[in-house]
Amino acid sequence: MNNMLQLIRKKLSPTTLNAAVFTSFNGRYSDSPKAISQKLHELAPEIPIIWLVSADQIKSVPTYAKAIDIDTQAGEEAWNKAKVRIDNVFCDASTNLNKTDLKSKILFGIKTYFKTKKGQKRYTTWHGTPLKMMGRDQIGNTNVGFSCPNTTLLLGNEFTKEVMERITYGTMPVQMIGCPRNDLLFNLTSNDIQVKKAELGLPAHKKVLLFAPTFRSDGDINNDNVYRSGINQLELMNVSKLLDAFSKRFSSEWVLVCRFHYHVDAKINWEDISVRYNGSIINGNSFPDMADYLVCADALMTDASSCMFDYMFTGRPCFLFFPDLDNYNKVERGMYFDINELPFSCSQSFDNLLESVGNFNESSYASKCNSFLNRIGNVDDGHASERVTEMIIHDLKK
């Protein structure tokens, strides 16, 4: 009853806040919403920008925007009353989206009615091209779908569109405008990279190997899942040998920057990691936005994270280190692509990873990346944020 009363109250409250209200990953200042927010301020500085962030992220929000704690009543009211809302995790999960019985249809209709508000527009960018299966496609979750009424999905390629339309059962309209967080990765200059390195506190005269594993979960954020989400891979590596291999193949001195999923970052002790690896690993979670680290990375190493697809736009080498590939693909999650169809070499052992680094071929890699982008129907061109900004300006000036 309380939930229904809350829905009614939200439905009846007027959409009086003539502003763009942003949130990312339910409380972070990052990702595509951040890119859109920056472009909106650049092109239309007169439009009020509000960010809903967790308390520890408030200082990350620039002074031209108003930061509100997402876990407060003020945050809830701003989200409810805003004329335009932008996020990257719509994620209203439902187990009934694929059911056709009358009761399920009625319940979904009621939910849609109360979450649809006249005069309010919501854009969701999602957060990457998927390799790992989601929603109804995921192993063991064939009845699960996602839906968020009154929301337009903004996507960067036809493949992701097909996946999202399937797992939302066609309940959300899609616009193919590109992935705003990727704009930063186009037309980078050496000066851009050095400026960003300085902002992140990365060594200016060393090359950066970014290790960014995905989060593995059986439905729980426990210590075992945290361990399996990058810590285990680190223990299988000899970091000194790894950096030597990159130095031999790509010249210069290299450093390893580890960027863990935020669920993992919240659980691990970076001081312990620094001691265990004699200070040879740099904390890549010190700043909230993954895109900044991708800008600085001279090479990327991951497993099933969508950052591999974003990173292709830099033209720099990417390697997959995936010791638990078979279990992840066949038992735990499932993947949309055969791993051998990707442009990246995939290694299940550390020795094989070293071989892949030594045998890397630039021209072959570039050709494979271009073919893959054509295959998935890529529309990213570095101007996605501008397109979304134009839509927001139009919505707020109606």
Task: Provide a role label for each language-model segment.
Residues 19-187:
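Active-site and donor-binding regions of nucleotide-sugar-utilizing enzymes
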